[in-house]
Amino acid sequence: MESAKSAAALVEPCQTNSARRLTEDDSLRVSVLSEALPYIQRFSGRRIVIKYGGAAMAHANLQEAVFRDLALLVSVGVEPVVVHGGGPEINQWLERLEIPAQFRDGLRVTDADTMDVVEMVLVGRVNKQIVNGLNQLGAKAVGLSGSDGNLVEARPWGDGSHGFVGDVARVNTDVLEPILAKGYVPVISSVAATVEGCSHNINADTVAGEIAAALEAEKLILLTDTPGILLDRDDPSSLVHQLRLSEARQLITEGVVAGGMTPKTECCIRALAQGVGAAHIIDGRVPHALLLEVFTDAGIGTMVVGRS
């Protein structure tokens, strides 16, 4: 009898402590889910266009986090559309093939040989890696380029001195509608052809913004290598969490937004001006940045809205 009591005395505290720990963990889970619930309800059935690139594409752990975030978005009824670049991998292949990489005004100078490599890497390699990653997690993905189904019509950028660098002339969403209606995730590389059938390399932010506008998306989200829009580019704590469209324009005019952040902010402004609900610039170096931005009160980056 004594030994039975001793055994019970040893077991009961363990059970009690275990139950207490589980309760704490469960409370945290419930809190997270409760915070996410109104956002899940709001965005279910809505379209979110995500530009995927930068560090989030270059590191395996961040890739996995992005793919899981996208799979979760799909599972709660959100309709994500992914647009991607692939600059680092393009540079690696240019180096292998001994083709010099050239940049001017922040854009890749793209001659015919470089364009062949860009198309091979973006359409044939990077796109399929993303599609495969999503498919493995149960998010049915379909790989496309801007040329497929005339999704994006390109035009030469500027005066043509950058070679086969393009801009978006027109977006035709007819090819996307049946894909989205069937629950698939379109994964789109930023290569598109002109009306003459000549392939051009287009900035992926630009492609994402124009597709978001054409789809009348709820959100445009740009994954970047910065926390978002900073009032002081050397001080991450100066992050601006939310801006109105007019305020974003003013920051560009005042030079607060400068350098590589300028085209990203301009991309957001154009998308909002064409009816996108909100545009976000977030730090893709943070694991699960997508979920933190979409499903939490605080978010993680900068959200630009058309009105208060």
UniProtKB/Swiss-Prot annotation:
GO terms for molecular function: acetylglutamate kinase activity; ATP binding. GO terms for biological process: arginine biosynthetic process via ornithine; L-arginine biosynthetic process. Substrate binds at G86, G87, R108, N201. Its main location: cytoplasm. CDD domains: AAK_NAGK-C. Pathway: Amino-acid biosynthesis; L-arginine biosynthesis; N(2)-acetyl-L-ornithine from L-glutamate: step 2/4. InterPro entries: AceGlu_kinase-like_sf, AcgluKinase_fam, ArgB, Asp/Glu/Uridylate_kinase, Glu/AcGlu_kinase, NAGK-C. It is found in: Cytoplasm. The keyword Amino-acid biosynthesis applies. Catalyzes the ATP-dependent phosphorylation of N-acetyl-L-glutamate. This is Acetylglutamate kinase. It comes from Prochlorococcus marinus (strain MIT 9313). The lineage of its organism: Bacteria, Bacillati, Cyanobacteriota, Cyanophyceae, Synechococcales.
